[in-house]
Curated annotation (Swiss-Prot):
The phosphoenolpyruvate-dependent sugar phosphotransferase system (sugar PTS), a major carbohydrate active transport system, catalyzes the phosphorylation of incoming sugar substrates concomitantly with their translocation across the cell membrane. The enzyme II complex composed of PtsG and Crr is involved in glucose transport. It comes from Bacillus anthracis. The active site is at H85. This is PTS system glucose-specific EIIA component. Keywords: Cytoplasm, Kinase, Metal-binding, Phosphoprotein, Phosphotransferase system, Sugar transport, Transferase, Transport, Zinc.
Length: 165
C-alpha cells in the first residue's frame, strides 16, 4: 500500500537523455540527410558540435561501436536504445580522425567520454559535422520529448526525455 501511495519501489520507465556533445541542438528534420530527417533510423535530435568529444547521454551499456568509430549505440537502463552518429557520410573516413574510449559491452555513466574526433578533419572530408542522436527503438517508446533551439553542454543539458511503454 505505501509503495503505491508514495511511489516507493516503483521502476520508472522515463529516461533523461543529456547532450552527448557541446553545440547547437536542432530538430532531427533539419539534418541534411533524408534517412535521419525522415526519422527512418528513429526519432531524436541533432547537435552541430563545437568540439570533438562525445560523452554518454545516459547511464547504460555500450551495445555497438562501429569499427570506423564514427557511430556508437548505447542502451539505457530503461531499455531506450540511442544511436549517436558523428557527422554525415563520416563512414567514408574509415576511422581517420576518430578515437574510441570505450568498447562494446562496457557499462557507462552519463558524462563518460565515449569518442573523440577531429572536428576540422570532419569539416574538410565529410558532408557535415551535424550529429544525429536518435532513439532506434522508437516503436517501444510511449513518448519522446525533445528540447531544440538551445546551445547544449555535453553531459549536462537535457535534450530528450524518453518514456518507454
Amino acid at each position: 500500500m505505501f509503495k503505491k501511495l508514495f511511489g516507493l519501489g516503483s521502476k520508472t520507465n522515463e529516461e533523461t537523455i543529456v547532450a552527448p556533445l557541446t553545440g547547437a541542438v536542432k530538430n532531427i528534420e533539419e539534418v541534411p540527410d533524408p534517412v535521419f530527417a525522415g526519422r527512418m533510423m528513429g526519432d531524436g535530435v541533432a547537435i552541430d558540435p563545437t568540439e570533438g568529444v562525445v560523452v554518454s547521454p545516459v547511464d547504460g551499456e555500450i551495445v555497438q561501436l562501429f569499427h570506423t568509430k564514427h557511430a556508437i549505440g548505447i542502451k539505457a537502463k530503461n531499455g531506450t536504445e540511442i544511436l549517436i552518429h558523428v557527422g554525415l557520410e563520416t563512414v567514408k573516413m574509415e576511422g581517420e580522425g576518430f578515437e574510441a574510449h570505450v568498447s562494446e559491452g562496457q557499462a557507462v555513466k552519463a558524462g563518460d567520454k565515449l569518442i573523440s574526433f577531429d572536428l576540422e578533419l570532419i569539416r574538410e572530408k565529410a558532408k557535415s559535422t551535424i550529429t544525429p542522436i536518435v532513439i532506434t527503438n522508437t516503436d517501444a517508446a510511449e513518448s519522446i520529448k525533445t528540447t531544440v533551439g538551445v546551445t547544449a553542454t555535453k553531459g549536462s543539458t537535457e535534450v530528450m526525455k524518453v518514456t518507454m511503454k
